[in-house]
Amino acid sequence: MSQNIRAEIRARFLKVDTSNVADVLDDMGLLHQGLAADFRSFSGTSGKLAGFAYTIRGQSTPYGMGGDAEKMTACQGISEDEISVWSGDGDGTCYFGELIALGLKERGCVGALADGGVRDIAWLNQHDFPVFA
C-alpha cells in the first residue's frame, strides 16, 4: 500500500468519532477492538490516535549510563504516519519519553501506545505527540 493511501486512510479516521468506528467494527463482527480501560492519554492533544501500527516487543528494564540504544535501534524501521506500539509486560517501568519520541517524530511517527510507564509528559504536550499508556 502506498504512503499516499495510508495517509488518506489515517486522515479519514481522524475525522470521525472513535465511538462511531467502534460501532461499525462491532456491526462487522469485529468485537473487542478498543483499548482496555487501563489505557489513557498522557498528552494534551486532541485525544485521537490514528495510524498504522509499528509494534515494538520486549521487556522494559533499567539501563546503565549512555542511553537506551536497544530501544532506539528498535525504532529505526518506523515509517511516516505510523504509531509506535510498545508491547511488553506493562509493569509500569518507563518505556517511553522525550528522547524516544523525538527520534520517532523525526521519522514521521504520529504517536505512541505504550504498555508500560511514560515520562516527560510536559515535552510530549509541547510537541503535540499523542501518547496513550
Please tell me what each predicted stretch does.
Residues 1-133:
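Feature captures the catalytic cores and cofactor-binding loops of soluble hydro-lyases/lyases
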